[in-house]
């Protein structure tokens, strides 16, 4: 199952640097950014915890399985990148 990973852009990293960090963690870029400074990545549900372990400087908080988009909830992971 493929989920979307919503990551708030870090003030300390450029978008290019952040994308490289996510790719290093094995996460493929799905959409570059949204109006809310959130970058959206595609991630396989079964790989999620392995991706977290493999990431170097990426820390995820407030991990949830459902994210409300408009009036509907979608399967997703939500993380804040520091």
Model-derived features with residue positions:
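Positively charged, small/polar-rich N-terminal and surface patches that mediate targeting and assembly
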Residues: 1-82
């Amino acid at each position: 199952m493929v989920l979307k990973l919503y990551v708030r852009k870090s003030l300390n990293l450029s978008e290019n640097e952040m994308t490289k960090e996510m790719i290093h963690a094995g996460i493929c870029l799905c959409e570059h950014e949204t109006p809310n400074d959130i970058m959206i990545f595609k991630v396989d549900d079964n790989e999620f915890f392995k991706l977290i372990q493999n990431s170097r400087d990426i820390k995820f908080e407030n991990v949830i399985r459902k994210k409300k988009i408009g009036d509907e909830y979608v399967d997703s992971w939500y993380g804040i990148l520091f």
